[in-house]
Amino acid sequence: MELTRVTAFCPGHISGYFLPVIHDDPDLSGSIGAGIVISEGVRVIAEKSADSTVKIFQTDRYGLPEEIAESSPVLMDLLAYMQVNASIETFCHLPIGSGYGMSAAALLGTVHALNALYNFHLSPRECARIAHRIEVQHQSGLGDISACQGGGFVIRKTPGPDGDIMRVIDTRPIYALTISPIKTSSVLSSHDMIAQITQSFPSRIPQNLDDIMSLSREFAEKSGLISKEIRTVLTACDKENLPASMTMLGCGVFALGKRAETVLKKFGEVFKLTISPGGPAILFGERSS
């Protein structure tokens, strides 16, 4: 009996700092930088169907879903690229467009779900390559797919899913606050912004999670991306000596350590996150009777 329905999960990713690397070959395009693969992400349900459809859901902190989009150009292009028809539903556990890598998680999770559903026998790296090509094409991101292939806090030394990536696990909690979304493509398509980001990129490799937090903050300060709303939150964190920076690319803040929750909750809903120990996974599949 063949599979008719597959559920997959992919963790999200908070980028602390990044440097776009653009190449004519999308496999060699992407970004270098550092970030954190987080425990929350996107659950994907893929079901065989005569026609392709996509629905996007946002779940609240209780897991209750709300449909927020009846289609997705990115996922529809993915289905066409993989030459399959399927009904896709994605359930995002964190706000979209807010620096949590939900777009990448939905994309990579969908590739893994379709791989299992249609028995393509693609390796995890091959799945990541497909997702990365679609991500670069749509400018929905440049480095999140590469990061979300596995867990840990991540240092991407070279671009793309085949790049040199270092991963280390840390058990300390991370707390995040979202103020408003930012459209990633609006930043990636701005030549002036890319030039400023390039000048702000750290000149050394971080040694640990604390170092990533420090370099992320330096990058955020130099890049000119910090808004007045983010500045207010960061100042409050600074007064409590909390390592904190801006979620890239999103209008929000992430901070390290248990005390961060008390500070951040003064400004809105706070998400408690942990570092994910791994990347995408197939949760279960249903077979025809």
Swiss-Prot record:
pH-activity dependence text: Optimum pH is 8.5.
GO biological process terms, semicolon-separated: coenzyme A biosynthetic process
Residue intervals passing through the bilayer: none
EC numbers, comma separated: 2.7.1.169
Keyword Kinase listed: yes
GO terms, molecular function: ATP binding; kinase activity
Pathway annotation: Cofactor biosynthesis; coenzyme A biosynthesis
Family: Belongs to the GHMP kinase family. PoK subfamily.
NCBIfam families: panto_kin_Meth
Name assigned to this protein: Pantoate kinase
